[in-house]
Structures are given as C-alpha cells and as structure tokens.
Amino acid sequence: MIRFNRWKLMSEALELLGRATSIEAALEVLRAHARAIGCADGVTVVRRDGAEIVYAGEDAVAPLWTGRRFPIEQCISGLAMIERRPIYIPDIYQDARVPHDLYRPTFVVGMAMFPLGIGDPVAALGVYWAKENPAEPDALALLDTLARSANSTFERLAIAREIAESRPGA
C-alpha cells in the first residue's frame, strides 16, 4: 500500500509541478509531497544565496533550521549543490561531512539531499529520517525523479520569464 501511495503522490506532484507558475509554487509542491513520498520525518527546502545557503521552508516533526544561514561548503545541502548530485547519508554520525554539533539537538539520523536547478543548482531538497538507514531504494529513486522534474519546471519558468521580459514594454 505504501508503494501505491508513493506513486499516487508522485503523480500528483508531477501534475502540480507542470502547472506551477512560480519558483515559490514549485518549491511548495516539493515541500508538501517529498515527506510523504519518502516516508520521512521531515523535509526542508534550502536556497542558495551566494556563498551561503538559507533554509527557506520545512515540514518536520520538530523544528530544524528555517530562516538560518550557513556557509555553502559546510553543509550537505551546499555540497549537493556544489557537486550537482544527490547525497544520501544513512547515518549522519558516521559521515565526517556532516556538522554533528548542528544535528545533535535534532531528530535527524538519516538524510538525503537533492540539488535543484539546471546547470548551477539554486536550491536543494532535504529529506530527513529519525532512524538509521531509513530510506528504501524506491523512495530515493522517486525523490530523485521529483527533484529532476522540479529542475524542468525551474527551466520552464526561467524561459517564460525571459520571454516576458524581452517583449516590448516589459
């Protein structure tokens, strides 16, 4: 039943991404659907701002870092953006890249980060679990597909914005 629900949620998310008229709307689709698709305890949307990242939104069992900023090289979301690839960490306390002091007060034990944006990623989708080695391969594959679909949405929105700005009188 979980697998069916994941696919149903994925289908809904893809439809909503296809209708999104702003980056903010697309990010909201990600935030609202990723947690259920991944059977996760929390999700965050992290935006790149120069050499920093800012936690722009979250849906989690307990507060994480909404509104806080961190140097891009010192967090997994930043590394996923820099490396332009998803990062899955089944146990954050076994991975030296994770700033353990920042995570100790939270529920997070396992996590995955998915970069968002074509070319140079502009954001990342963070998915968090309260247990070690939590993610099923199906869930990770669907979350990766969701992030890639969001990338297509971001590209479509950027092209639409460029066209609108190039019109006389715009």
Q: Language-model features: where?
A:
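GAF sensory/regulatory domain recognition
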Residues: R31-R35, V43-R68
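Sensory-domain boundary capping and coupling elements
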Residues: S77, L116-W129, T153
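Allosteric cytosolic regulatory segments
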Residues: D144-N151
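Acidic/proline- and glycine-rich, intrinsically disordered low-complexity segments
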Residues: L64-I87
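Short regulatory alpha-helical segment in sensory/regulatory domains of signaling proteins that mediates
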Residues: L14-R19, L30-C39, T44-R47, M81, ...
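Signal-transmission linkers at sensory-effector interfaces
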Residues: M1-E24, A36, T153-A170
